[in-house]
Curated annotation (Swiss-Prot):
Keywords: DNA-binding, Transcription, Transcription regulation. One of its GO terms (cellular component) is cytosol. It holds the Pfam family HTH_AsnC-type. InterPro entries: AsnC-type_HTH_dom, Dimeric_a/b-barrel, Tscrpt_reg_AsnC-like, WH-like_DNA-bd_sf, WH_DNA-bd_sf. One of its GO terms (molecular function) is sequence-specific DNA binding. The keyword Ribosomal protein does not apply. The keyword Disulfide bond does not apply. Residues 6-66 form the HTH asnC-type domain. SMART domains: HTH_ASNC. PROSITE patterns: HTH_ASNC_2 (PS50956). GO terms for biological process: response to amino acid. This is Uncharacterized HTH-type transcriptional regulator PH1055.
Length: 159
């Protein structure tokens, strides 16, 4: 994938939106020295190009939900279409909150949640058991979220 360059102003907009995704274009403009319309154009352009996604980040630990990260090793001889089918199922599952392709001993990292440990276990089993492409997996139970999607959870350090 080709590396894309962002301007200094684009990075400033992104930095402010990471701190407060609801910040108005006018407020961003005041802080970085651009007009409201210039900020709006840049923000919309970043969103249209797929570089910027504004979304909510659910804090499972704050809600009392149980969550885990599942490391999955894909069988080396698995046909590409089987792997894509598995990844699509992960992406469509309502209990997955993060999915990454990773390098190392495992190929995929999946964030999964449930209301309690029993539901979490069921959700993980539904994702993994019976998948022909899965060679092995490892579950890491989440204890506390300190940072997610580049946003530090400073209050998590207080406990």
């Amino acid at each position: 994938m080709k590396k894309r360059k962002l301007s200094k102003k684009d990075w400033e907009i992104i930095k402010l939106l990471k701190k407060d995704a609801r910040m108005s274009d006018a407020e961003i403009g005041r802080r970085i020295g651009l007009s409201k319309s210039a900020v709006r154009w840049r923000r919309i352009n970043l969103q249209k190009r797929g570089y910027l996604l504004i979304s909510a980040y659910l804090r499972f630990d704050k809600l009392g939900y149980t969550y885990a990260f599942v490391l999955v090793k894909i069988k080396p001889d698995t046909p590409r279409n089987e792997i894509l089918k598995f990844k699509k199922a992960l992406m469509e599952n309502e209990h997955t909150f993060e999915i990454y392709e990773v390098l190392g001993d495992y190929n995929v990292l999946i964030g999964v949640f449930g209301e309690d440990v029993s539901e979490l276990k069921r959700n993980i089993q539904e994702l993994i058991i019976g998948q022909k492409c899965v060679q092995e997996y490892k579950v890491l139970l989440g204890a506390k979220s300190l940072k997610g999607l580049e946003v530090p959870f400073w209050d998590a350090l207080e406990d």
